Amino acid sequence: MIPEPRDALAVPMRPAGFCVGPGHMVVYGNAAFVAEFGDRCVGLPAREGMLGLPADAFAVLDAVFASGRPLARWIRRDEEDWRLTAAPRVDPETDETIGVAFHLRARSDTPILRAAS
């Protein structure tokens, strides 16, 4: 099966990014992230740049960085429920957690379904 182009799926791109260190300095944000939080957010600690997220969101990033285990939870922002999913990024040489990758998805988003092969 040939993958359909993203536009054909009619799925909006959602904010995703990568942060490093215990202060969660944002080093990458996709186009949706930059549109949502601004281009100046990249290079700032997440708590300073990702305005509008509740404290629970940063507690998830803290827990993932400290434990080295992925986590997800529902958060409330802009009167809507969003799913924050975060996964540790590990240095392959030292096996230390060096950062956290994360993305946000609205509860109202339609699940992406793939045809069975």
Where on the chain are the PLM-derived regions?
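Sensory modules in modular signal-transduction proteins
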Residues: M1-V34, S117
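Short, surface-exposed beta-strand-loop junctions and turns on beta-sheet-rich folds
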Residues: F33-A35, V90-D91
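Terminal output helix/cap of sensory domains in signal transduction proteins
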Residues: G49-D78
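Sensory coupling linkers of modular signal transduction proteins
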Residues: R89-S117
